[in-house]
Structure formats: structure tokens, C-alpha cells
């Protein structure tokens, strides 16, 4: 075995971090049956000599490889991946990572991707690595036959997903995260459906602990080694530690995409591999944002290409879907604030009702969540602001409940409008309507008049003149009766009469003046309505009279015009007498 293969085998296994499953991980089915684990919990080191022809399988029974005396090396020009090498690599990862479901996928992706030409044999190789069959020669011949195209198609984008199509079966056994479910529904290749049973068997034997997001980075060790076949063996912790995409061997250092995503286009197929691997731990909002900061703006991070939107609206999926125009907006700063506000985002990705801070606003993006974090800091200021308004108007007996409702209403209605900050958040429509409803039953020096004094123009002292809040003064029946009686006597009051009436009714002069103004406006409206009704009645009556006017002459007569008769005679008598040539006509009343 060459040094490159040894480097690939040890890259993910030699991790200084403990397994996230702890001692309980030793009870998993594949690990219990794996004899390759040593006493100290580490995997056996990969020797630089030739591999034995009898590798240990997952069942623990040594089988004789059908490859004979052939030994496999990783040459720089690229070589085939034999079943024994794949199985041995899977043994390393399963023994070191504690049979985690993410560890199995990570082991498959880390050991090197089969290229698009190998799509038909990859499920068989996976089946051989878990349950050995007697078809190893046939699989090896197929791998060697397709090896000739491996160096050409090394960086080509993949066509289908051989191991992730069994996601619907995997959901029943190992609780996969939501973003991998969304990716499973997008891939509908018919030929890739044959690998569903093998992937289901592989994942059903694993422990049901895939929600632990530390499992995918527990075996990383922060090491990223580039093999000779054009793939990159990487760990999740290496993404967090690096500052830019590492390119060690030129074009061979590019990340080969794993075949499980729909084609994002020619904008960058190498990005799809990293994003799909991040799909395993999508509840890590900070990790996804860290990689998004490293992507150039032209790479496909838009939701119409990579639908990483989970149905439960977890925090990381909303970061990738709510801000599609700017890929740089998902910087680590945004996601750090997001992770601060959502302290338990791993639990929130499975049950959105257990969201710690804001269960009502799951579909909000990262910018609005930052705005919400600022809102919690500005909330005491907004509660103090209505109290300052009360100090400006001491004659208004505003209750403390109105200020609390104003502060609460501003904190709830502030999120759909993130551009409103400070004191403007308290002046949105729900909070203002709450205040007006509570203050509507109180006697305030203001009515709905148009020319009130300056002290009753508006309770807002910050210059917000767009919407003036009008409050209505409630008068008793005795006060209204006295005011109406005075208005029937005099439409306008002098200053002395207004002062005396206000003193007798226990009102202020301003309230009496505004009431008389409103009453005069109402009286004028009533007069205008009555005049309009009278005019309409007169016009209708005039129209009726125009219709009933009698015809005094005929168009075909040769005689001259006859003057109208005296009032005591019927007009038809003289009309018929003047026309001797025409026959007599009945009176007009019989015609009408």
C-alpha cells in the first residue's frame, strides 16, 4: 500500500476528541460485531505493506478474497477502489466513531467518491462492505473496467445519489435530520432506487442517535488530506478551523461533489459536495454560516438551487432561505447572533414549539432575528417612553396598564418592521389602538374637533405628526341635555356665557367650546341635507308638472294660433271650434 492510502485511512480515525456517544456507543450492533477494534479504543494502524487477502468483515468471520494474489495500490493517476479496501476503511470509521449514522456516511464520503461511471457498482460495494457476498470477482472486474474513465471524470459533476435514496426507510430507524429529508425528495433517479435497500440495512443497524451533531466532528481531528484520486478527505472541524478553501495539489485539491444533489448548474459543482455534507448537521447554524462566508458570490447558495429548508423552520435552514439575494449576508457574525438568541437550536430543529425565546417567529430570517435581539435590549427604553409621555401631559389620568400594553404591543409588532427602532416601535397601530380603547372612557380635554388648542392637539411629544390620536370626551346625559337646550337658544356663545355654562356643568371652557363647534357643524350638515332633500323634491314635482302640460295645437293644422280660453271653460271646446276641418277630440283628462 502506498503512503497516500495510509494517509487516507488514518485521517479521520486519529481524533483527539472523545466520541460523543461515550461508553454507550460500545453497545451498537456494528461495533459489537467488529473485531477490528483494539483495546485502547483506537483503530489498528494501516501498515504500508501489502494488504492481507483475508480481511475481516462486519460479521467478524474471515473470508477469502477472490482477488488472488493481486495487491491494490493508490497510484497518482487514480486507481480502482476494491471492496476489501472499502470494507477495511469502514471498519476503521465504525470502530473509532462509535457506529454513529453520520460516521457511516462520513466514512463513505471521506474514503473517496465513486465517479458517475461507477454508479451501478457503488451499492454493491456498500453491500459488500457490510454483508460480504460471493460476487467479489465480478465487482472487481467492473471496477477495473470503469477505472479507465476515472481520471477524465474526476472533477465532473455527479448524476445521481446511490446511497441517499433510501432516506424514507432510514427515517423510520435512524432519526435523520430534516435537511437530508428534503434532499431525498429532490432526487428521483430510477436507477438509484436500487440502492435503497442496502442503505436502509446499513442505517438500520446503527444507533438512533443522529441528532447529536458532535458525532460528525468527533472523529475529525482537524485534518484535511488530499488523496491521489482527486477527492478530499475532510472533517467537519477542518471547515471550522480554516480561513479559506484549501487547494493543496492544484486541480486535484478541489472537492469532488458527492452524488446526492440535483444539478445546481455550471456555477460550481464543487460547492454542492460541501453543502450536502453540511446537510447532515444542518442544525449547526454557526457551521453553515462559516462555510457560507467562504463561498464566492457566484456559487450556488440560493434556495431555488439548494433547497435546505426544513419543514420545522429550524434556525439554520431559515438562514439559507430567507436571504437569497446576498450570499455574503450569512456571515459568521449573523449566525453568531443567531446562535446566541437560539440557545438550543438542536432541539428546536425537531420540535418548533420548544423554541426558547421567540416561538411565534420561526419563519423570520437572520436579520430579523438580530433585530429581535436588539428589540430585547431596547424593550426597557420603550417601556420608559410612554411614561415620559405621561409626564408631558399630567392632566391625562392614564393608567399604568396602557403603558405596559404599549410596551408589549411594540415588542410584538416590531418584528415585521425591522427598520423601525427606538421610540417609533411604540407607535405602531396595535399599541396605539390599545391605548385609545383604554383612554376612550376617560374624560380628557379633547374631542374630535378640528381646531382645538395646543395642549389637546396630540399626546405625542416627539414630533410624530403623521397620525394624531383623537380621544373622545364622554358627557353625561344631564350635561348633553343642558348643552342642547343652550344651543337651541343661541348658536354662538360669548366668553362670559361659555365660562358660566362650563362652571355649571363642571366642564372646562375648552370642552364647552369644542362641543359647540361640533354641534354647529352637525347643524350645518343637517341644514344642507334638508336643503338638498327639498331641492330634489322640487325638481321631481317640476318634472311631473312638465309632463302634464296639455297640447294646445296640432302639427297639421292650417288655422292660426288660438289664444288660451278663460279659466271657466274647458280648453278643448275652443280648440275643437277653431278647427272645423278636424274631427272633434275627447278631453285631455280622458287621454291622461
From Swiss-Prot:
Gene behind the chain: Hmx
One GO process term, biological-process aspect: cell differentiation
Example GO molecular function: DNA binding
Region (Disordered): 1-83, 132-183, 248-269, 305-473
Protein name (Swiss-Prot/TrEMBL): Homeobox protein Hmx
Subcellular location: Nucleus
InterPro entries in the cross-refs: HD (IPR001356), HD_metazoa (IPR020479), HMX_Homeobox_TF (IPR051300), Homeobox_CS (IPR017970), Homeodomain-like_sf (IPR009057)
Tree of life domain: Eukaryota
Family the UniProt entry places it in: Belongs to the HMX homeobox family.
Protein function: Transcription factor involved in specification of neuronal cell types.
Organism in which the protein naturally occurs: Drosophila melanogaster
Amino acid at each position: 500500500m502506498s503512503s497516500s492510502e495510509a494517509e487516507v485511512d488514518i485521517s479521520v480515525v486519529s481524533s483527539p476528541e472523545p466520541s460523543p456517544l461515550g461508553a454507550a456507543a460500545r453497545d451498537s450492533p456494528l461495533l459489537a460485531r467488529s473485531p477490528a477494534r483494539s483495546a485502547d479504543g483506537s483503530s489498528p494502524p494501516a501498515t504500508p505493506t501489502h494488504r492481507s487477502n483475508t480481511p475481516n468483515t462486519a460479521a467478524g468471520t474471515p473470508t477469502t478474497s477472490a482477488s488472488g494474489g493481486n495487491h491494490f495500490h493508490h497510484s497518482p493517476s487514480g486507481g480502482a477502489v476494491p471492496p476489501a479496501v472499502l470494507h477495511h476503511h469502514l471498519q476503521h470509521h465504525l470502530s473509532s466513531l462509535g457506529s454513529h449514522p453520520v460516521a457511516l456516511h462520513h466514512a463513505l464520503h471521506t474514503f473517496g467518491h465513486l465517479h458517475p461511471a461507477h454508479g451501478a457498482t457503488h451499492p454493491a460495494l456498500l453491500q459488500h462492505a457490510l454483508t460480504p457476498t460471493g460476487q467479489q470477482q465480478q465487482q472487481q472486474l467492473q471496477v477495473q473496467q470503469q477505472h479507465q474513465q476515472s481520471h477524465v471524470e474526476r472533477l465532473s459533476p455527479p448524476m445521481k445519489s446511490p446511497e441517499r435514496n433510501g432516506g424514507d426507510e432510514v427515517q423510520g430507524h435512524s432519526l435523520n435530520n430534516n435537511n437530508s429529508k428534503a434532499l431525498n425528495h429532490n432526487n428521483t433517479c430510477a436507477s438509484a432506487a436500487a440502492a435503497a435497500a442496502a442503505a436502509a440495512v446499513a442505517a438500520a443497524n446503527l444507533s438512533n442517535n443522529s441528532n447529536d451533531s458532535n458525532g460528525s466532528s468527533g472523529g475529525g481531528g482537524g485534518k484535511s488530506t488530499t488523496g491521489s484520486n482527486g477527492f478530499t478527505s475532510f472533517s467537519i472541524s477542518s471547515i471550522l478551523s480554516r480561513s479559506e478553501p484549501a487547494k493543496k495539489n492544484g486541480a486535484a485539491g478541489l472537492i469532488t461533489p458527492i452524488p446526492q444533489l440535483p444539478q445546481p448548474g455550471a456555477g460550481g459543482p464543487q460547492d454542492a459536495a460541501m453543502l450536502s455534507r453540511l446537510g447532515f448537521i444542518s442544525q449547526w447554524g454557526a457551521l453553515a454560516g462559516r462555510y457560507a462566508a467562504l463561498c464566492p458570490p457566484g456559487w450556488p447558495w440560493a434556495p431555488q438551487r439548494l433547497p435546505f429548508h426544513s419543514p420545522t423552520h429550524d434556525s439554520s435552514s431559515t438562514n439559507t432561505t430567507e436571504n437569497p439575494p446576498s450570499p455574503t449576508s450569512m456571515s459568521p457574525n449573523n449566525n453568531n447572533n443567531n446562535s446566541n438568541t437560539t440557545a438550543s437550536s438542536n432541539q428546536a430543529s425537531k420540535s418548533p414549539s420548544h423554541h426558547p425565546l421567540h416561538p411565534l417567529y420561526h419563519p423570520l430570517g437572520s436579520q430579523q432575528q438580530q433585530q429581535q435581539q436588539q428589540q430585547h435590549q431596547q424593550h426597557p427604553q420603550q417601556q420608559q417612553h410612554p411614561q415620559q409621555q405621561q409626564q408631558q401631559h399630567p392632566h391625562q389620568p392614564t393608567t399604568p396598564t396602557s403603558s405596559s400594553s404599549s410596551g408589549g404591543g411594540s415588542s410584538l409588532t416590531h418584528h415585521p418592521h425591522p427598520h423601525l427602532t427606538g421610540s417609533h416601535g411604540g407607535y405602531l397601530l396595535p399599541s396605539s389602538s390599545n391605548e385609545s380603547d383604554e383612554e376612550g372612557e376617560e374624560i380628557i380635554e379633547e374631542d374630535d374637533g378640528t381646531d382645538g388648542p395646543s395642549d389637546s392637539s396630540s399626546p405625542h411629544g416627539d414630533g410624530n405628526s403623521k397620525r394624531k390620536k383623537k380621544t373622545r370626551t364622554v358627557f353625561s346625559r344631564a350635561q348633553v341635555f343642558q348643552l342642547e337646550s343652550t344651543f337651541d337658544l343661541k348658536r354662538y356663545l360669548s366668553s362670559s356665557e361659555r365660562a358660566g355654562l362650563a362652571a355649571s356643568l363642571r366642564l372646562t371652557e375648552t370642552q364647552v367650546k369644542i362641543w359647540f363647534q361640533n354641534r354647529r357643524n352637525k347643524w350645518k350638515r343637517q341644514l344642507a341635507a334638508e336643503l338638498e332633500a327639498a331641492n330634489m323634491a322640487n325638481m321631481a314635482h317640476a318634472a311631473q308638472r312638465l309632463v302634464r302640460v296639455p297640447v294646445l295645437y296640432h302639427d297639421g293644422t292650417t288655422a292660426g294660433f288660438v289664444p288660451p280660453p278663460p279659466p271657466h271653460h274647458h280648453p278643448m271646446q275652443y280648440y275643437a271650434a277653431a278647427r272645423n276641418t278636424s274631427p272633434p277630440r275627447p278631453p285631455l283628462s280622458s287621454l291622461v
